[in-house]
Amino acid sequence: MKNRYLIIFIIFLYSISISAQNEAYTKGVYVDKQKNSMPYRFLQPKKMEKGKKYPLVLFLHGAGERGNDNESQLRNGGTVFSNPANREKYPCFVLFPQCPEEAYWSLEKRPDQGYKSGNPLPKDTPITSHLRLVKELLDETLATYPIDPKRVYIMGISMGAIATLDMVYRFPDTFAKAVSICGATNIERMREFKGKTQFRFYHGDIDDVIPVTYSREAYEALKSTGKKVEYIEFYGANHNAWHPAFNTKDFLEWSFR
């Protein structure tokens, strides 16, 4: 009985800690000229030196965090950056936009056959209105804050990883590094990529939502053209590879190196 209460108490304290860390992110809503809007959360370095510029991380969430509450997008990944130790060691700006409930970052709708049959991601397709808003929000942020344009990074999980690779392909001169966790892309895009972005892919080997072959093939395609790319595969991990990815010893170190 005592052990049960202790566990409940520990969970309670952990929840308070997570909530406090998420509160470090300010809330905002980006509105374009046509009055289209997108909620986002924004983290700034705890201490900023005058005249110094800092990195920025654009983080794109997965399908499970869609909505308009401006909270859910922090569920997976938010505390990676707001954790006090990491915030001290890696001072940076972090941007977490939120995709609408019924929408997808890079697709007008989810592929009818999911991601297991062929490659449902077209090579040539117009940018979605949601990713366009993300790019506009990013550009506005870069113009407003002391951000080093040579240290703009992008990360994403699942649906957000698909969007990460989409954004890098569309804007090859914007991102210094890209992290894709259990994502997918059209392989021809990777073969044709001309930018200098460095890539790191994470994927679980038994992913039953987005097959691991997408990341394996993307890695091989980039590697074959001489790009700087790394690939980490988690044995026995399903479509939640962000958990071991975030706990990889050099997850942030690689990005900020």
Name the predicted role of every residue range.
Residues 1-23:
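Bacterial Sec-dependent N-terminal signal peptides
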Residues 47-52, 106-154:
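Gly/Ser-rich "nucleophile elbow"/oxyanion-hole loop immediately N-terminal to the catalytic nucleophile
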Residues 65-131:
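Active-site machinery of serine-nucleophile hydrolases
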Residues 75-85, 182-192, 213, 217:
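Alpha-helical scaffolding within the catalytic cores
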Residues 139-194:
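Primarily recognizes the serine-hydrolase "nucleophile elbow" in alpha/beta-hydrolase
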Residues 181, 189, 198-257:
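C-terminal catalytic histidine-bearing segment of alpha/beta-hydrolase fold enzymes
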